[in-house]
Amino acid sequence: MISTSQIPDSFVSPCRRASVSRTTKETDVQVTIDLDGSGNCRAQTGIPFLDHMLQQIASHAAIDLDVRATGDIEIDDHHTNEDVGITLGQALLQALGDKKGIVRFGHFVAPLDEALVQVALDFSGRPHLSYGLEIPTQRVGTYDTQLVREFFVALVNHSQMTLHIRQLDGINSHHIIEATFKAFARAMSMAIAIDPRRAGIIPSSKGVL
């Protein structure tokens, strides 16, 4: 029987969890993330549609996510939506640490009825968003569909990832957005996975990300 002390450090998975808080005059946001979770989610942002999308991320990326937010939603959802994206991005970056051993790249195409969305991402350390959604309505329920892009802008900038989103088909706004979040989650699940062939190695020819 081999004890854990006999296992090389490079094969021991680090704790990939983070908790981040952000407080401004407009919002108060707390995010806890566990990249090696099982898809559990508790999302209470005051924005029901955003909560639903955060649940898609947790479920389809198989991460545990706890997001609490209060904000000036009596004005509109913009500040809370953006600050949740910022805080989630910061928590994701912190949980990834030095990124040793991760696959780094992820890609997925998700269908939802008539909608089809392609997502590719890279935890490169270089924030970039290429956003190609054409959402036909201004709102889904009470949620302003312009805020989808604002959420991903905030998330990308603060997680330092490169993210490409392409809508291949779709006419229903809810389906397009939900397919996007599902594709993003599945691509992220691939990218954050540990590659046993690269255990303890930063996945870059430069040696740093």
From Swiss-Prot:
One cellular component (GO) term of this entry: cytoplasm
Subcellular location: Cytoplasm
Highest taxon of source: Bacteria
Keywords for this protein: Amino-acid biosynthesis, Cytoplasm, Histidine biosynthesis, Lyase
Main location: cytoplasm
Classification via SUPFAM superfamilies: Ribosomal protein S5 domain 2-like
Gene Ontology molecular function terms on file: imidazoleglycerol-phosphate dehydratase activity
Top EC class for this record: lyase
Pfam family, one: IGPD
The EC number(s) this enzyme carries: 4.2.1.19
HAMAP family (alphabetical): HisB
PANTHER family on file: IMIDAZOLEGLYCEROL-PHOSPHATE DEHYDRATASE, IMIDAZOLEGLYCEROL-PHOSPHATE DEHYDRATASE HIS7
Family to which the UniProt record says this protein belongs: Belongs to the imidazoleglycerol-phosphate dehydratase family.
Protein name: Imidazoleglycerol-phosphate dehydratase
